[in-house]
A protein has these predicted regions:
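Conserved catalytic Lys-bearing alpha helix of Rossmann-like short-chain dehydrogenase/reductases
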Residues: 72-78, 127-135, 169
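NAD(P)-dependent short-chain dehydrogenase/reductase
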Residues: 102-111, 136-213, 237-244
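Conserved Rossmann-fold NAD(P)-dependent oxidoreductase catalytic core, especially the SDR/UDP-sugar
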Residues: 76-121, 147
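N-terminal Rossmann-fold NAD(P) dinucleotide-binding loop
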Residues: 3-4
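Active-site helix of classical SDR
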Residues: 113, 123, 127-130
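NAD(P)H-binding glycine-rich loop region in Rossmannoid oxidoreductase-like domains
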Residues: 32-72, 84
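Adenosine-cofactor binding site in Rossmann-like domains, unifying the SAM/SAH pocket
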Residues: 11-37
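C-terminal substrate-binding subdomain of Rossmann-fold SDR/epimerase-dehydratase oxidoreductases
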Residues: 9, 178-296
């Protein structure tokens, strides 16, 4: 999702640049030899590493080994290939999942490794922490500008709308739409609906990141990127209900995991560099719903 948004924004904002895309169809980025060969052939000035194995709570709970191992392989492969090719600049797309389960809110960048991680996200988070620290070490040891973006949860066009792997907003839109079409009286929500999450529209993030490539030396080692406010799970489902036009209600399965109670970022450091997301939740979810309908 973010990768496709970056490609679209690059064409708009930097049309004169020579952009090389490496998708999973081109190279298995878990394969260190294949990744090394691809980077050596292209010899880029900058790399945006947005590849990751991602999913919702259900998927991470069912396959923790996959989320840890695949992301460790991806990140070590890409970053080591960049180091070997002496690529001067790399932007690593991390995750707010790297922050502790129970700690002060909002999170600041120095809160990394300050307390235990959320158990459901632990495997994925450990891999993303390793990727972030690898960038930090490479920058310190070799003098490269390898920096880490730590976005809040993201939503936007081209998301994964599957109920097994989709993130909250995409899954909510898919479930509410299905209930609307079927005439179901209620939609089931995991947990009690009170857990709070911060979501940023992927196009806003992509546009700003594209503007930053070539200037990552001005960044600290890692930087939070969020909208600065959060909503409860129920509030996101209510927004999906408004966007879809669904008139039914909600049921709650409190036996299912809902993740940590709150995760919100302090993006003050990014604001000093010009970060200022503009898309409201209602506008963003309306665009996502249109994208969902066009994909059906």
């Amino acid at each position: 999702m973010l990768g496709s948004s970056i490609v679209e924004q690059w064409a708009v904002c930097r049309p004169a640049d020579e952009l090389h895309l490496i998708t999973r169809d081109d190279v298995d980025l878990r394969d260190r030899g294949a990744t090394r060969a691809a980077v050596a052939q292209i010899q880029p000035d900058s790399i945006i590493h947005a590849a990751a194995v991602v999913g919702g709570i259900a998927a991470k709970k069912a396959n923790p080994t996959k989320y840890l191992l695949d992301n460790l392989l991806l990140d070590s492969s890409v970053i080591s290939a960049a180091i070997e090719a002496r690529v001067p600049e790399l932007l690593y797309i991390g995750s707010a999942a790297v922050y502790p389960e129970v700690y002060r809110q909002p999170f600041v960048e120095s809160d990394l490794l300050a307390a235990p991680l959320e158990p459901v996200n632990e495997g994925y988070a450990i891999a993303k922490i390793a990727g972030a620290k690898l960038c930090e070490y490479a920058s310190s040891e070799y003098g490269f500008d390898y920096r880490v973006a730590l976005p809040s949860n993201l939503y936007g066009p081209n998301d994964d709308y599957s109920l097994s792997h989709g993130h909250l907003i995409a899954a909510a839109i898919a479930k509410v739409h299905a209930a609307h079409v079927a005439g179901d009286a209620k939609v089931l929500i995991w947990g009690d609906g009170t857990a709070r999450r911060e979501f940023t529209y992927s196009t806003d993030l992509a546009e700003w990141l594209v503007s930053q490539v070539g200037h990552l030396g001005q960044w600290p080692a890692r930087i939070n990127l969020g909208v600065g406010h959060d909503h409860s799970i129920t509030e996101y489902y209510e927004a999906a209900r408004r966007v879809v036009g669904y008139t039914g209600g909600f049921d709650y399965d409190t036996d299912k995991p809902a993740g940590m109670k709150q995760r919100i970022l302090d993006s003050g450091m990014a604001h000093t560099l010009g970060w200022s997301p503009q898309t409201s939740l209602e506008d963003g979810m309306t665009r996502v719903y249109r994208s969902y309908l066009s994909a059906q």
